């Protein structure tokens, strides 16, 4: 008997199986009318051009086919390297790769830059040295001391920068030349290596000297690793991860992708030297000779990438400003925030976990009662049977396999009319809150610091927004009491308070600035309640006479239009007829013609350029703006309208972080930035500094840029994050 889901599916399809067998059976008794002697002769196939295929596979990044063709010909592909890294699974490269995990896009990006510096195509021309003695180390110390710019990278024992230990260091000062200094390889038969202490004592003066300029790929990680060993990295001049992000935010930014895209060069992946899956070993167990090829090329490729990407940025003043004045300095601020971490109340989270567990059990009982039978709430298959077969609810959409979908979008739509989906959504929300935060956060406390250390990624969102992971601070819900309880567990240490500084209606203010709409500018300039003012304009009444319901409608319209909401979306959001929603939108644009003009011009510019820009000149690429698919193209046009607002808000909060950190340092204050979430900065402030920091935050954040409308910041103080609002 075939058991489980496979058996169940077979039994349900018994009547159809004979037809299925007929469909998949290849007929060999067909009358072809003539005998086919040879497929090759019939199709007139020409011999494949193996050399041309080799070049094509290299250009397109078809790695498996490329390796097979190389093996067949006994050669390497043009530009293929003999060894380096995937910037993503090991140490310093890990967060670089994860941070650049955006899908490749189809927008009309600039043509690849042709590097002015010759790149050795033949692996034999590349000179990689493994530094195994003091004499070799001394030679390389002389070389990096004399170089104008040095590519630098670390190899480590862990993806977590707070616990990673150094295994080796790679350096490159010239095209085709690099070295690897192993200090921590441990395996049976490993050769003698220079001691970690002796290497760091020699490197420390150079690493900590701001006059010696360094370039790397995601140097934020390497800075953490060196701090684990008591070294504060200085002289960070360039970062190829950030260069790529500034140029083409919609592309991948890991080193494999960058080397392939810009250098036509294939790098060795981490799996090639360390294995993958359950068999993967730590880098400290990788044989030194393999590690040397991998890591030395990593530094060398970084140097090549910088020499390829930097001239493109240097040629455009606005991009150079984004890179030099925002991305490079904010990377340093983020590293310090990550290092500082945040204190959490583990006992409070444990209590909340227990409470959530009880609520989930109660909800599960209610769900089973509403369904008329018990079932596994975590099983999409069983849930689909309950919703669509037993209860007969309408199928909103289907999965790729053809089954009715039970995702959040579907349940949200069904919840408008049916009680069971509403209960399921509530159960899912609480279950995620419990597993992701109440249960997981205490396990993420670093035993050495007693704090939780999130990781901020700069190169993920095409808008310039930051993202965070382990834990993800951006997704903690704030609209529910349970979500707010999670924020209560982010606490201040004794003698300090949590201070939150949040930009008020920042995207609406940016819309007013960009659209130059007179009525919208006036509402902000006069300090009016902008939603009440909008309601007055739409309904043709004085703002003082606007009802709470009318203000709610106006608020939905204000924020909805920023995100390109259609009449259909507005109708669904407000629970009104589509014709009524269309009338509201028409009235809005009649009262705010500058907003409509801005939207129309932005769509046109996006189609012409393939990107839109922030107030500061950051380019926001739109991958699907020329898609043949109407829905995808429409989504890209909606994104084009919102991206300048989101992107400018991202630039403003980054500039604020830079300004606040400099002010704290210059003033010798003990207050510390500890989190950045959406449009909010969160600090740990000693009691004696509260008024000073409150005044400084307000002044710096409202004055970080001069827009056509004033910037406003709401500042709160409390013993925990929630009470600071």
Question: Where does each model-flagged region fall?
Answer:
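A short alpha->loop->secondary-structure connector
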Residues: 227-237, 251-257, 517-521
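Conserved "right-hand" nucleotidyltransferase catalytic core of DNA-directed polymerases
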Residues: 13-189, 208, 217, 245, ...
């Amino acid at each position: 008997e075939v058991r489980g889901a496979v058996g169940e599916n077979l039994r349900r399809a018994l009547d159809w199986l004979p037809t299925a067998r007929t469909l998949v059976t290849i007929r060999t008794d067909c009358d072809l009318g003539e005998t086919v002697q040879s497929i090759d002769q019939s199709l007139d196939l020409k011999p494949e051009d193996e050399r041309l295929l080799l070049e094509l596979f290299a250009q397109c990044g078809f790695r498996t086919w490329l390796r097979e063709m190389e093996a067949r010909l006994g050669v390497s592909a043009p530009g293929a390297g003999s060894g380096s890294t995937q910037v993503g699974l090991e140490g310093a490269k890990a967060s670089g790769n994860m941070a650049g995990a955006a899908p490749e896009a189809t927008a009309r990006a600039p043509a690849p830059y042709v590097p002015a510096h010759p790149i050795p195509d033949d692996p034999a021309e590349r000179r990689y040295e493994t530094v195994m003695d003091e004499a070799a180390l001394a030679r390389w110390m002389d070389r990096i001391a004399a170089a104008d710019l040095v590519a630098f990278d670390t190899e480590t024992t862990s993806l977590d920068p707070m616990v990673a230990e150094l295994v080796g260091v790679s350096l490159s000062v010239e095209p085709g030349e690099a070295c690897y200094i192993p200090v921590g390889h441990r395996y049976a038969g490993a050769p003698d290596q220079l001691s970690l202490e002796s290497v760091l004592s020699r490197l420390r003066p150079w690493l900590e000297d701001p006059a010696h300029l360094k370039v790397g790929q995601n140097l934020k990680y390497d800075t953490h690793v060196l701090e684990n060993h008591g070294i504060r990295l200085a002289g960070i001049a360039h970062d190829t991860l950030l260069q790529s992000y500034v140029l083409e935010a919609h592309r991948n930014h890991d080193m494999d992708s960058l080397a392939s895209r810009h250098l036509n060069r294939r790098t060795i992946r981490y799996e090639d030297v360390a294995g993958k899956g359950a068999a993967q070993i730590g880098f400290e167990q990788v044989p030194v000779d393999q590690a040397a090829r991998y890591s030395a090329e990593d530094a060398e490729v970084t140097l090549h990438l910088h020499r390829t990407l930097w001239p493109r940025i240097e040629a455009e003043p606005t991009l150079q400003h984004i890179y030099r004045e925002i991305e490079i300095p904010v990377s340093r601020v983020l590293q310090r925030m990550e290092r500082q971490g945040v204190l959490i109340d583990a006992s409070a989270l444990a209590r909340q976990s227990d409470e959530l567990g009880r609520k989930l059990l109660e909800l599960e009982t209610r769900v089973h009662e509403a369904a008329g039978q018990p079932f596994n709430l975590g099983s999409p298959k069983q849930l689909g049977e309950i919703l669509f077969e037993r209860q007969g609810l309408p199928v909103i959409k289907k999965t790729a396999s053809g089954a009715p979908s039970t995702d959040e979008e579907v349940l949200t739509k069904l919840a408008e009319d049916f009680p069971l989906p509403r209960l399921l959504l509530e159960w899912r929300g609480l279950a995620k809150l419990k597993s992701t935060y109440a249960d997981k956060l205490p396990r993420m406390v670093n035993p050495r610091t007693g704090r939780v250390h999130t990781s901020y990624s700069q190169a993920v969102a095409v808008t310039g927004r930051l993202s965070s992971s382990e834990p993800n601070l951006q997704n903690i819900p704030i609209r529910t009491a349970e979500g707010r309880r999670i924020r209560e567990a982010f606490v201040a240490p004794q003698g300090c308070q949590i201070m939150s500084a949040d930009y008020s209606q920042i995207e609406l203010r940016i819309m007013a600035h960009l659209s130059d709409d007179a009525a919208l500018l006036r509402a902000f300039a006069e300090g009016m309640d902008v939603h009440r003012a909008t309601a007055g304009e739409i309904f043709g009444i004085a703002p003082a006479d606007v009802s709470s319901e009318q203000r709610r409608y106006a608020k939905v319209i204000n924020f909805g239009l920023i995100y390109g909401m259609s009449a259909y979306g507005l109708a669904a959001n407000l629970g009104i007829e589509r014709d009524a929603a269309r009338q509201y939108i028409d009235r809005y644009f009649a009262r705010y013609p500058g907003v409509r003009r801005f939207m129309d011009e932005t769509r046109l510019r996006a189609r012409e350029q393939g990107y839109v820009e922030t107030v500061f000149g950051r380019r926001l690429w739109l991958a699907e703006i020329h898609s043949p698919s109407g829905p995808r193209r429409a989504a890209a046009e909606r994104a084009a309208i919102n991206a300048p607002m989101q992107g400018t808000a991202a630039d403003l909060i980054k500039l604020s972080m830079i300004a606040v950190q400099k002010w704290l340092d210059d003033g010798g204050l003990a207050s510390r930035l500890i989190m950045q979430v959406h449009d909010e900065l969160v600090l740990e402030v000693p009691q004696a500094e509260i008024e000073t920091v409150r005044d400084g935050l307000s002044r710096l954040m409202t004055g970080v840029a001069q827009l056509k409308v004033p910037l406003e910041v709401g500042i709160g103080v409390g013993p925990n994050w929630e009470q600071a609002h």
